[in-house]
């Protein structure tokens, strides 16, 4: 029997511990291995690397764990979902399934990275650059309060307590520009090519991402879209038991 390997990628400001409740709902089985890399602490996975460089380094990490040829499932939340898309692009055959939670597929345009000719990308770049400066210099409590007050995070639980000493401000700041949505290419064709591998999850109270996901269903034929009840953008914190149960059902048939 092939082993099943789960790789969880947290979001911006995230920690591996964010997945604790999800992991608690998964079966205890000798054939199941769980990995929760901390890409803000691992130099090979940090934002000093571009999306493409990051994907190459992440694939090396996965293969170093002896996972090639096994059932590998990649679960990414928010920024972690966008990174997961690049890992899927880098080596599709490595992944049995990719679960993308509260994930943005990128602007629906032909640009490969930031291009000021795109008004959408220019506006996003300006916004992310503002936050990069805030995370670098503003008082920690102030920047966290303002970050959490953004409309996209409304209607749900706040994140766990984030303690300044557990982070490098320089790393957080760099992540906001290096991995800005303005730098990300359109991933719709990738999703279409790997449609059998992709599970797209979104919280039903996440108005922005619900609308985006419905459009994505029209743009990508056969997309498996799962709506998580009573959840905002922060599905991971609003409904970790629900998320864990969905993953459990997926892997139960493989063990």
Residue ranges with predicted function:
Residues 207-212:
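Conserved alpha/beta-hydrolase "acid-adjacent" motif
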Residues 53-72:
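Conserved acidic catalytic loop of the alpha/beta-hydrolase fold
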Residues 194, 200-202:
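Short beta-strand/loop motif that positions the catalytic acidic residue
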Residues 2-45:
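Conserved HGGG/HGGXW glycine-rich cap/lid loop of the alpha/beta-hydrolase fold
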Residues 89, 97-134:
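Flexible "cap/lid" loop of the alpha/beta hydrolase fold
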Residues 231-240, 244:
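Catalytic histidine-centered segment of alpha/beta-hydrolase-like enzymes
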Residues 76-80, 84:
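Gly/Ala-rich beta-loop-alpha elbow adjacent to hydrolase catalytic centers
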Residues 159-190:
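Hydrophobic, aromatic-rich cap/lid helix
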């Amino acid at each position: 029997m092939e082993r099943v390997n789960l790789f969880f990628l947290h979001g911006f400001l995230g920690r591996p511990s964010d997945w604790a409740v999800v992991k608690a709902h998964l079966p205890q089985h000798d054939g199941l291995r769980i990995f929760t890399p901390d890409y803000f602490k691992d130099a090979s996975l940090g934002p000093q690397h571009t999306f493409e460089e990051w994907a190459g380094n992440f694939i090396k990490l996965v293969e170093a764990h002896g996972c090639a040829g096994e059932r590998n499932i990649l679960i990414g939340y928010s920024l972690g979902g966008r990174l997961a898309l690049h890992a899927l692009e880098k080596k599709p055959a490595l992944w049995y399934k990719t679960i993308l939670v509260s994930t943005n597929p990128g602007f629906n345009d032909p640009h490969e990275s930031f291009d000021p000719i795109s008004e959408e990308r220019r506006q996003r770049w300006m916004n992310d650059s503002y936050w990069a400066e805030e995370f670098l210099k503003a008082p920690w409590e102030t920047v966290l309060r303002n970050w959490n007050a953004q409309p996209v995070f409304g209607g749900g639980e706040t994140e766990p307590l984030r303690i300044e000493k557990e982070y490098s401000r320089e790393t957080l700041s760099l992540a906001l520009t290096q991995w800005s949505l303005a730098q990300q290419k359109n991933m719709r064709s990738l999703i279409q090519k790997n449609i059998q591998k992709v599970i797209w999850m979104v919280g039903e109270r996440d108005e922005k991402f619900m609308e985006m996901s419905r459009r994505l269903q029209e743009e990508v034929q056969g997309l498996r879209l799962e709506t998580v009840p009573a959840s905002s953008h922060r599905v991971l914190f609003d409904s970790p038991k629900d998320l864990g149960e969905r993953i459990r059902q997926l892997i139960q048939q493989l063990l």
